[in-house]
């Protein structure tokens, strides 16, 4: 990378990243460097949601490189997704008017329930399109969409529920990172992902109480809708990456949720 020659920083690619994230070292200083991240990162840093932003530079080839404070620590375990701190942090993000204004300012996109269905059907393989359980789920979601309660307002949603995106530092600071999927959406969009992907680890009622959710009938309907929708999207992703064992397990879980609904 030309940036090393231009600045004297030594870059070490990080595992799990596709040439986008590095540990940068220069004169015993260590930073987390990432190419072409969202301009929204500055607001996240100011709000203490992501590690402190140190600087932003443009490289000679036109890439934007951001540098953040290097945090020694670890990502959360799956079982830790049930922590009160996770739910409370997510609520703080959803409730932040500052983040909402900043995301709008940098051109953040609005993502609605119908966009989820469009995303699912785009490029959907025939094996999934005609699978009886998945077909039943899509018919149910389409039917419910017509009368799905509309949220009073959209908020900043992270858009990628994963324990690997939660960083717990050695100083016990909790950060939510990797904001490439951020959108303005129904808070149930984020929450439905967590309830779908971590249904075995999260006690739903306890977690929703920690989030301080207003558990109206309308909100529960939206949560249930997004939980089914996110399950379908995850099944599609598992199929596309040939993770068939995981896909089959998710289909079994999806079928249980459908039976609870109908």
Where are these regions (language model features)?
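A glycine-centered beta->alpha junction motif in the catalytic cores
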Residues: 59-79, 114-126, 231-244
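Active-site Asp-x-Gly
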Residues: 169-220
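Conserved N-terminal boundary motif of the eukaryotic protein kinase catalytic domain
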Residues: 4-12
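An alpha-helical support segment within catalytic cores of ATP-dependent transferases
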Residues: 2-5, 98-159, 256, 261
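Active-site acidic catalytic loop and adjacent metal/ATP-binding pocket
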Residues: 21-24, 143-189
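A general structural signal for well-ordered alpha-helical segments in protein cores
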Residues: 50, 90, 114-117, 204, ...
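ATP-binding pocket architecture of kinase catalytic cores
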Residues: 11-103
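Helix-rich C-terminal or lid/interface subdomains of diverse kinases
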Residues: 196-198, 210-262
